[in-house]
Regions:
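Flexible, glycine-/charge-rich segments associated with ATP-binding catalytic modules
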Residues: 2-13, 136-205
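Conserved ATP-binding N-box helix of the HATPase_c
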Residues: 56, 82-105, 131-140
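Short beta-strand/loop element within the Bergerat-fold HATPase_c
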Residues: 102-114, 118
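Short beta-to-alpha transition helix within the HATPase_c
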Residues: 42-59
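Conserved catalytic submotifs in the C-terminal HATPase_c
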Residues: 69-77
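Short conserved segments within the C-terminal catalytic ATPase subdomain
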Residues: 60-70
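Conserved ATP-binding motifs of the histidine kinase catalytic
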Residues: 42, 75, 82, 86
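Conserved micro-motifs of the catalytic ATP-binding
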Residues: 35-39, 78-81
């Protein structure tokens, strides 16, 4: 667990060292930190970042093959975003699909921007924390976010019309910003307190 000088993380670190289960509290803290993340002058290659994140998520969860499909751009997509915000947004979308659904993530260039599209079939619809994260990412990058979802109850919730969510983000490229190296999938996979393990808690192996 990254502690730094945050008293909340120091407290959770002490609780974890004493054997307490801090995953639920750490999840709430990670989401709060992501939503409060300030603008950054450094860029993430969203194509590489998302590919690594989805690779780690696919290996971390107990799910059938094919529940997640990712199509990343072969070209870099540098966007000035805090890493913790992007990771939280992507993982919350993936979590929607984990109980019994499937997810599709695509990233492509488009007229000076990165275009990220998320689609998921979800028995529970879109969780309350997902849309604010996506909108915050769009706002920090100076972009746009469009999202929709079918109702959880009623006609669209039957077997022929399973509930779904969809979101599209258009995020301007930051081609002159310093580019951060993407994380390593193994670090996200094997660190018990990584965003993958914490934000997908309850579904990981």
């Amino acid at each position: 667990m990254q502690v730094f000088d945050d008293p909340r993380r120091l407290r959770l670190s002490g609780m974890a060292a004493a054997g307490a289960d801090v995953q639920p509290q750490l999840r709430l803290l990670m989401l709060a930190e992501a939503l409060a993340a300030p603008p950054t002058h450094r860029a993430l290659d969203l194509s590489a970042e998302t590919a690594v994140l989805c690779t780690a998520a696919s290996e971390a969860v107990r799910r059938r093959p094919g529940w997640l499909y990712v199509m990343s751009s072969p070209a870099p997509l540098p966007v000035a975003l805090p890493r913790n915000l992007w990771q939280a947004a992507v993982l919350c979308v993936l979590r929607c699909a984990l109980p019994a659904g499937r997810a599709v993530v695509t990233l492509q260039p488009g007229a000076g921007a990165a275009v990220a599209v998320f689609r998921a079939v979800s028995a529970a619809g879109m969780p309350a924390d997902t849309l604010p994260l996506l909108r915050r990412a769009a706002a920090l990058a100076g972009g746009l976010c469009l999202a929709t979802g079918s109702p959880v109850h009623g006609h669209s919730a039957d077997a022929a019309h399973p509930p779904h969510i969809a979101a599209a983000l258009r995020l301007p490229l930051a081609i002159h910003a310093p580019l951060r190296e993407p994380p390593i999938a193994e670090d996200l996979l094997y660190d018990r307190y990584s965003p993958v393990q914490v934000l997908l808690d309850g579904f990981t192996v």
